[in-house]
Design a protein with these regions (language model features):
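Pyridoxal 5′-phosphate
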Residues: 1-406
Length: 406
């Protein structure tokens, strides 16, 4: 019954053609796009062009002739409308961690007399580690409050509210507008980590009056492992924001080679070192794909896939603890489940060709990337998961020892 319905839904799916634009290995159903997106077929050709022609043939001239120097701003401008920002407010550069450090530092410098960076326990570790690093330098004070009590914790000592919009384990999303408004009412600035939202669900940074944001390029934007991240600074802060990593590419005139640093006047001030051209070129391919389809269409299908997955599990009487919100409007493009042997179960699924994501200590995440997942895939995943749980094949010792990367 569910397979027949899946075939009907796949035939009617307006996004079905986009699956053919990805390199997908035979015998694998991939539900880990929330951790590393799949490879677009256009990416190898783009990289070969950059390597063979722009680098191999044109050499250093390509900084001008191929527009290498403009890639961070160009890719950032393409990401901007996908996260509810204007083109001049976003730039693609560095990693999410480095961009967090830049923007937390900038926000603290804009808030004299306040040092507290407020976040929640269980936020993605790098977000919390960046606060710790600044705290050790005497520049910040870390305060963690459970998500249900964040608004009441916003007092006049809070310089910055820093939250991840979609939680990396549970997929639960924050009400960006409500929390941003509450922070501003308390005199605080807000920094949103969009790593599990960008390219997956509608975000309206400018509409919510967000101050700062960061996000990564290798998940839903399919930019490849270690792809450059992106950073957002609201237009109203572009002049005042000053980041501490004053590398030469963030200079107002980098090729004047001045002894003294003068920050670029716009979003380019967030640049630090020489841009990673290969990574940016690959990221641009993934971003162009998302832009071609549109976030609203992607989100609609990802939510439909998630609900269909829940129905398939119910049909098979799979008893497993859902930790994602049941309300689709309150979660991103993933469903997460808790099981004490989550790691071993994930390994048993991988052995059967179903790749999901494990999050320590006991969470399994299944990313619903709508560009390349079919409803028929979901039926098969539910079948395999049910069989793995019923047979307890995950108890095999070969599935018990964690790899270095889990």
């Amino acid at each position: 019954m569910m397979l027949e319905r899946a075939r009907f839904l796949d035939a009617a799916d307006p996004l079905r053609e986009f699956r053919e634009r990805f390199m997908l290995p035979d015998g694998v159903i991939y539900l880990d796009g929330n951790s590393l997106g799949c490879l677009p077929k256009a990416t190898p050709a783009r990289l070969e062009k950059v390597v063979r022609e722009e680098w191999g043939r044109d050499l250093i001239r390509s900084w001008n002739t191929a527009g290498w120097i403009d890639l961070p701003a160009r890719v950032g401008a393409k990401i901007a409308p996908l996260i509810g920002a204007r083109p001049h407010e976003v730039i693609a550069c560095d990693s999410t961690s480095v961009n967090l450090f830049k923007l937390i530092s900038a926000a603290l410098a804009m808030q004299p007399g306040r040092k507290v960076v407020l976040s929640e326990p269980g936020n993605f570790p790098t977000d919390l580690y960046m606060i710790d690093g600044l705290e050790r330098q005497g520049l910040a004070e870390r305060r963690l409050t459970e998500r249900g009590r964040l608004i009441e914790a916003l007092d006049d000592s809070v310089a910055l509210l820093m939250l991840t919009h979609t939680h990396y384990k549970t997929g639960e999303t924050f009400d960006m507008a409500e929390l941003t408004r509450a922070a501003h009412d308390a005199g605080a600035l807000v920094l949103w980590d969009l790593s599990h939202s960008g390219g997956a669900l509608p975000v309206d940074l400018d509409g919510c009056a967000a101050d700062f944001a960061v996000g990564c390029g290798y998940k839903y934007f399919n930019g490849g492992p270690g792809a450059p991240a992106y950073a957002f600074v609201a237009e109203k802060h572009l002049e005042a924001a000053r980041q501490p990593l004053t590398g030469w590419m963030g200079h107002a005139a980098p090729f004047a080679f001045s002894d003294d640093y003068e920050a670029a006047p716009g979003i380019e001030k967030l640049l630090c070192g020489t841009p990673p051209i290969l990574g940016l070129a690959a990221l641009e391919v993934g971003v162009d794909l998302i832009a071609e389809i549109g976030i609203d269409r992607l989100y609609a299908k990802s939510q439909a896939l998630s609900e269909f997955f829940r129905q398939c599990l119910s049909e098979r009487n799979v008893a497993i603890d859902l930790v994602s919100p049941t309300d689709p409007a309150r979660r991103g493009s993933q469903l997460s489940f808790r099981h004490q042997d989550a790691y071993a179960i994930c390994q048993a699924l991988i052995a059967r060709g179903v790749i999901g994501d494990f999050r320590a200590p006991n969470v399994m995440c299944f990313g619903m990337a709508p560009l390349y997942l079919r409803y028929a895939d979901i039926v098969w995943v539910a079948k395999v998961l049910a069989e793995v749980l019923d047979s307890e094949e995950w108890r095999d010792p070969c599935f018990q020892t964690p790899a270095e990367v889990t």
